[in-house]
């Protein structure tokens, strides 16, 4: 498979002020060659990105793994994605043979791996990747209006820094090489606070423990970002594309 080669670019946890506004699918297609690939997605959540990849790229097969057992049970009810196999395991213990995938993708999930298991997770990714295989790591950047709302009940600054440091260690270890680091913003449009609450507070993969008083603060901050067109946020992201050496 023809893949992009390494560019000499330093790693940064946050990007420049001016960034393109685009979708993750556009970035994926620009950075990866999916044709005929066997793909592993770690932390597939409700399988939104899983569906996009399965339906809009040329992959041959895909394993979509999720550690949240409640969400995994829901994913198993999906019947219209014949290329996809849903599985229940984490990045630190990938249930797959050695050198069995061309591409591994993590959408906003690396920072959810426990800090003590991050290095083990990269060792597992190295194990199951084919020689020359790629790891696409998309992480949210800890800044912006959307982040200002979320941090009130889910402050991820420390774990995101830990995930970023783990990427650096994986490169320094010689297992992986950095191909490219890219920054972009994606647009999140929400109709109401109720939609925000349902999608980000009332989740099954984490216990938010949001008190009534805190919920009022979250709502107030969310409402403060209302625009004429509604609740529209440009969310900053960082993608690190690695290749197995």
Ranges and model annotations:
Residues 102-117:
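A short SAM/SAH-binding and catalytic strip from SAM-dependent methyltransferases
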Residues 134-162:
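Conserved class I S-adenosyl-L-methionine
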């Amino acid at each position: 498979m023809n893949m992009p080669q390494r560019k000499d670019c330093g790693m940064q946890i946050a990007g420049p002020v001016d960034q393109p506004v685009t979708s993750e699918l556009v970035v994926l297609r620009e950075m990866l060659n999916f044709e005929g690939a066997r793909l592993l997605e770690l932390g597939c959540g409700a399988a939104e990105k899983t569906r996009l990849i399965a339906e809009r790229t040329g992959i041959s097969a895909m394993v979509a793994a999720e550690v949240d057992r409640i969400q995994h049970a829901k994913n198993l009810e999906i019947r219209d994605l014949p290329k996809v196999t849903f599985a229940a395991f984490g990045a630190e213990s990938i249930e797959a043979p050695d050198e069995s995938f061309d591409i591994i993708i993590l959408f906003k999930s690396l920072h959810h791996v426990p800090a003590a298991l991050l290095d083990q997770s990269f060792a597992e990714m190295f194990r199951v990747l084919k020689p020359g295989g790629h790891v696409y790591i998309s992480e949210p950047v800890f800044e912006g209006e959307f982040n200002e709302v979320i941090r009130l009940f889910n402050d991820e600054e420390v774990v995101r820094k830990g995930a970023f440091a783990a990427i650096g260690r994986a490169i320094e270890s010689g297992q992986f090489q950095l191909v490219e680091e890219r920054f972009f913003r994606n647009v999140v449009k929400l109709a109401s606070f109720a939609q925000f609450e349902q999608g980000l507070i009332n989740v099954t993969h984490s216990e938010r423990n949001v008190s009534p008083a805190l919920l009022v603060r979250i709502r107030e901050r969310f409402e403060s970002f209302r625009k004429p067109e509604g609740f529209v946020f440009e969310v900053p992201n960082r993608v690190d594309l690695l290749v197995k050496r």
